[in-house]
From Swiss-Prot:
The gene is luxS. It comes from Citrobacter koseri (strain ATCC BAA-895 / CDC 4225-83 / SGSC4696). Fe cation binds at residues 54, 58, 128. This is S-ribosylhomocysteine lyase. Keywords: Autoinducer synthesis, Iron, Lyase, Metal-binding, Quorum sensing. The lineage of its organism: Bacteria, Pseudomonadati, Pseudomonadota, Gammaproteobacteria, Enterobacterales. Its cofactor is Fe cation. One of its GO terms (biological process) is quorum sensing.
Amino acid sequence: MPLLDSFTVDHTRMEAPAVRVAKTMNTPHGDTITVFDLRFCIPNKEVMPEKGIHTLEHLFAGFMRNHLNGNGVEIIDISPMGCRTGFYMSLIGTPDEQRVADAWKAAMADVLKVKEQNQIPELNVYQCGTYQMHSLSEAQDIARHILEHDVRINSNEELALPKDKLQELHI
């Protein structure tokens, strides 16, 4: 099985909250697609609660688009990581990490402005696969955590696992 890019970085050295360019690729038509690792939690030390991350998924996608789309950037998708320590964001364009960090913080401020659970987009049986698994208060706790900390930049070069370590791990 091929080694995925996300598993070539040392999760024991990742900072959070932090932005990292996880991957950049070009389409056959010349568009650049950038995948960002938006790390909310320190891997293996913190985890977002399932209801909170699910609610955040519904809110974050729209709020990030409000703050980041434009000037050569269009978000394709924002999805939670299975480990519940962050989100992956795929987009067309190449915004720098600071622009992404600023949009992220603005989106978290928007999450705190949501007053009622019924204001969560697509929160119904028709548009959500587990519409009863939500918590606005947990999502707002996550947002508060981000806003109370500096959003840093994680560098692939600094986090790269050495080849000998990858071999030791049988990868």
